[in-house]
């Protein structure tokens, strides 16, 4: 069987023509070579540009190559092709098309069945396993890093009645045997702290609200337990549907909502791995792609639906999805969904459609931060839940080496070239504040001999997916991005994150640099700072101190000046949030005794009962949050998050 890396490399760059003129020019930048080598990846926005010289990667023949990145599982409309879990023909049989989907006269490879109250996994399929899990030598299928064992020392705080003891390994029981096999094929060797607690919490029928640092395994934290319980207990019976589209309506058992197209696609990819050979058929829907194709994919069967709120609302209104059988509701990156203005859609989906009541389903909320308004959402959506805080919520990982450089705006490009020239050949993400700057910087780097591509909200879905695929494969190892790629994306082996433009909000800085140092790996985060960024000085100093990083003298000096002038800040003030250690708002001053901190390998301390009043919502937050919010407000800064930058 050919190594999947070789297959991807063969597909990654299609030659734009013949002859040496379409090959990388020898000595032209880091990717120089002779005329027999393949052409370099060309970003989508540059493919139709005509150049008069052989600069960049055009070689002696001049002009940029027009090869396009291939090997993606997206069709020409930019939609995910559900090839593994697809099918044809119409049926209500769960073992084939399933749950309002299409029929096949024989079982599809990689898809199991639920028959007569029993789970019947399908036979193993070598081709599918290579596609889903890759090979052990392929670093793009990385599951853990050299510092993974350090997660055992991360403190874990769990509050609520009857907190179960954490698991210490992936075993059956408590997990289903098939899921353990899929986890093993994914080369996960041990659970992260959030996974150690989420598995027994969900197995015990409890709701969960989890805060964990970025890169801590939140996706597995909800996929592992809900899939395991689904394999053990099976689907809910399908009620008879009525209406014009009743025969085409799907009835998923699991619903996962997340804010962006990239994040739901990533969750879907992970779900395919862990649902392999099971009766659970994953599907994904999101805006910006052909809804007709997504409906056709749904009709092939859908038991686990991953969706953005806007597209899901559309499908519900069209009568193509029923939520009546939902057993598990997952809200991932809940704070970002509210930042993007999705709260009305989320409340409509959860409270006004046919989803079972909070008492008749299990609900899990995951995110890196949980300000007050998110905790209020939890009060409405969750019942008798356990609040889980892993590590210092809202802080950065010590696996990331942070470097703050003082660079004036006009010197940024020169310093960036020095950094890229001196660094090792690893994947690098460069963040800018505007879409125009992202395109400008990608063009500049390309002209200087660095294969770069850009991703932001103005790119079509097809272009975005092609650019991400090129970046992950190394065909274009430099990705210039706006905030569209800053949250949730789990791209293995990102060695360096560069904040070319610092964000106005320190939380956004945290999530940007969290693209490196994931799953216990080490990474470097470099930020270009000057006096135009004074609004985040206080937050930067606190983050560096918390993560045991060096605070540059110039930053400390500007921090003292800003503090004296009363204009520090950079925190998101409009939402009443806090970046201090998040605590369960139910543990107010008027009720509930608090226990101690546990660690990820032991049981949690014994927490008292949650207060019955629950009125003192802010009492659990650190006092410094108030000074952050007031400073932010007095500086005259509004909410820096723009929905348009994400879409």
Curated annotation (Swiss-Prot):
Keyword presence, ATP-binding: yes
Motif (DEAD box): 332-335
Primary gene name: DED1
Binding-site residues, ATP: 212-219
SUPFAM superfamilies for the chain: P-loop containing nucleoside triphosphate hydrolases (SSF52540)
Region entry Disordered, spans: 1-122, 566-647
Protein name as it appears in the record: ATP-dependent RNA helicase DED1
Record keywords, A-Z: ATP-binding, Cytoplasm, Helicase, Hydrolase, Initiation factor, Nucleotide-binding, Protein biosynthesis, RNA-binding
Catalytic activity: ATP + H2O = ADP + phosphate + H(+)
Comp. bias intervals (Low complexity): 609-647
Regions that span the bilayer: none
Record field: compositional bias (Polar residues): 1-12
Record's function text: ATP-binding RNA helicase involved in translation initiation. Remodels RNA in response to ADP and ATP concentrations by facilitating disruption, but also formation of RNA duplexes.
Enzyme type, top EC level: hydrolase
Biased composition (Gly residues): 16-35, 55-70, 566-579, 589-608
All copies of domain Helicase ATP-binding, residue ranges: 199-388
Organism of derivation: Scheffersomyces stipitis (strain ATCC 58785 / CBS 6054 / NBRC 10063 / NRRL Y-11545)
């Amino acid at each position: 069987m050919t190594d999947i890396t070789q297959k991807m490399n063969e597909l990654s760059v299609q030659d734009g023509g013949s002859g040496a003129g379409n090959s990388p020019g020898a000595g032209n930048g880091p990717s120089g070579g002779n005329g027999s080598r393949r052409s370099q990846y060309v970003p989508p926005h540059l493919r139709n540009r005509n150049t008069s010289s052989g600069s960049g990667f055009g070689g002696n023949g001049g002009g940029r190559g027009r090869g396009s990145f291939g090997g993606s599982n997206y069709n020409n409309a930019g939609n995910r092709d559900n090839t593994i879990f697809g099918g044809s023909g119409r049926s209500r049989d769960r073992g084939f098309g399933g749950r309002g989907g299409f029929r096949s006269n024989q079982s599809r490879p990689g898809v199991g069945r639920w028959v007569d109250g029993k789970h019947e996994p399908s036979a193993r399929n070598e081709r599918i396993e290579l596609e889903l899990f890759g090979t052990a030598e392929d670093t793009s299928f990385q599951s853990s890093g050299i510092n993974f064992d350090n997660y055992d020392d991360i403190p874990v705080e769990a509050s609520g009645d009857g907190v179960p003891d954490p698991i210490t390994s992936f075993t059956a029981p408590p997990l289903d045997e098939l899921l353990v096999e899929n986890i093993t094929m994914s080369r996960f060797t041990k659970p992260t702290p959030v996974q150690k607690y989420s598995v027994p919490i969900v197995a015990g029928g409890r709701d969960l609200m989890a805060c964990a640092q970025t890169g801590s395994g939140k996706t597995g934290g909800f996929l592992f337990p809900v899939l395991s319980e689904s394999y053990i207990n099976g689907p809910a019976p399908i009620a008879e549907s009525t209406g014009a589209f009743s025969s085409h309506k799907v009835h998923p058992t699991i619903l996962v909502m997340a804010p962006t197209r990239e994040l739901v696609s990533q969750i879907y990819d992970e779900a395919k791995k862990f649902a392999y050979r099971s009766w659970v058929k994953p599907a994904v829907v999101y805006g910006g792609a052909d809804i007709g194709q997504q409906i056709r994919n749904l009709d092939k069967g859908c038991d686990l639906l991953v969706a953005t709120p806007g597209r899901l609302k559309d499908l519900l209104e069209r009568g193509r999805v029923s939520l009546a059988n939902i057993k598990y509701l997952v809200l991932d990156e809940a704070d970002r969904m509210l930042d993007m203005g999705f709260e009305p859609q989320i409340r409509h989906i959860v409270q006004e459609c046919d989803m079972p009541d909070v008492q008749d389903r299990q609900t899990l909320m995951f995110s890196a931060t949980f300000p007050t308004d998110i905790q209020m959402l939890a009060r409405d959506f969750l019942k008798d839940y356990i609040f889980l805080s892993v590590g210092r919520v809202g802080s950065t990982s010590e696996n990331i080496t942070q470097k703050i450089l003082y660079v004036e705006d006009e010197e940024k490009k020169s310093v960036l070239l020095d950094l890229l020239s001196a660094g090792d050949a690893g994947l690098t993400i460069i963040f800018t504040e505007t879409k125009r700057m992202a395109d400008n910087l990608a063009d500049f780097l390309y002209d200087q001999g660095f294969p770069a591509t850009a991703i932001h909200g103005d790119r079509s879905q097809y272009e975005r997916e092609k650019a991400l695929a090129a970046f992950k494969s190394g065909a274009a190892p430099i990705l210039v991005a706006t905030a569209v790629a800053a949250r949730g994306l789990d791209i293995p082996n990102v060695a360096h994150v560069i904040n070319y433009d610092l964000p106005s909000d320190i939380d956004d800085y945290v999530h940007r640099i969290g693209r490196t140092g994931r799953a216990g790996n080490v990474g470097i985060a470099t930020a270009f700072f000057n006096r135009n960024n004074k609004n985040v000085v206080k937050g930067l100093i606190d983050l560096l101190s918390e993560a045991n990083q060096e605070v540059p003298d110039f930053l400390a000096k500007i921090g003292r000046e800003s503090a004296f002038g009363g204009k520090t800040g950079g925190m998101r003030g409009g939402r009443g949030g806090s970046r201090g250690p998040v605590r369960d708002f139910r543990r107010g001053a008027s009720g509930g005794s608090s226990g101690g901190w546990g660690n990820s390998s032991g049981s949690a301390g014994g927490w008292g009962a949650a207060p019955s009043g629950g009125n003192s919502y802010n009492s659990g937050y650190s006092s410094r949050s108030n000074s952050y919010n007031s400073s932010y407000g007095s500086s005259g800064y509004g909410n820096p998050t723009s929905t348009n930058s994400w879409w």
